[in-house]
Design a protein with these regions (language model features):
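N-terminal domain-start signal
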Residues: 1-185
């Protein structure tokens, strides 16, 4: 009976949060809109993400800025669920965060492998990762090569699977992605 109450509360919390998500029909309607400002106007008019979009100014109507806001909302939702859970349920959520961590590492690998000149733009994720993750964004943004990136992951569980590829010839981004996915699953 205890598990029913414990998990029933979590399921109820998630269902309540789920009711505020976009439906497949909403996505179809959004796909028919022309331009980011039209999508934002539709989301505002239909009551989605008001706490995120209400403060958005016209100069921040760039897709990248909006993606950052929505990603932060995803992290905020994770935090709400995490705080609601007991210690046993938090163990699962700690495993679930690996998805966010591997996405972050993949992003950083793309930056260093493709030698992008633009600096890492990860400061908007910093608070979340500092609190819930073993990965230091401060260390990752200093990486300019794959070797540096892997070294900056030394104190994490991702160091071993990635460092195993380091001395092999012809390693590509796909190989690193595959190693992370295999480790995660």
């Amino acid at each position: 009976m205890g598990n029913l109450l414990t998990y029933g509360g979590i399921v109820t919390k998630i269902r309540a949060m789920e009711s505020k998500l976009l439906t497949p029909g909403d996505f179809e309607e959004i796909a028919g809109l022309h331009g980011v400002p039209a999508v934002i106007a539709w989301l505002r008019d239909n009551g989605f993400y008001p706490f995120v979009l209400d403060d958005l100014t016209d100069e921040h109507l760039h897709r990248g800025d909006i993606e950052k806001l929505l990603i932060n909302q995803l992290y905020y939702d994770y935090m709400k669920i995490f705080r609601f859970c007991g210690l046993e349920q938090r163990k699962f959520l700690t495993l679930y965060i690996m998805r966010y961590e591997t996405d972050l590492i993949d992003y950083c690998l793309r930056i260093v492998i493709n030698h992008y000149q633009e600096p890492f733009d990860l400061n908007y994720k910093k608070d979340f990762f500092d609190r819930y993750s073993q990965i230091s964004i401060e260390k990752l943004i200093t990486s300019r090569t794959t070797d540096q990136l892997i070294e900056n992951l030394k104190d994490t569980e991702y160091y071993k699977p990635l460092s195993a590829l380091r001395d092999k010839a012809g390693i590509t981004l796909f190989d690193y992605d595959l190693a992370l996915d295999q480790y995660r699953f």
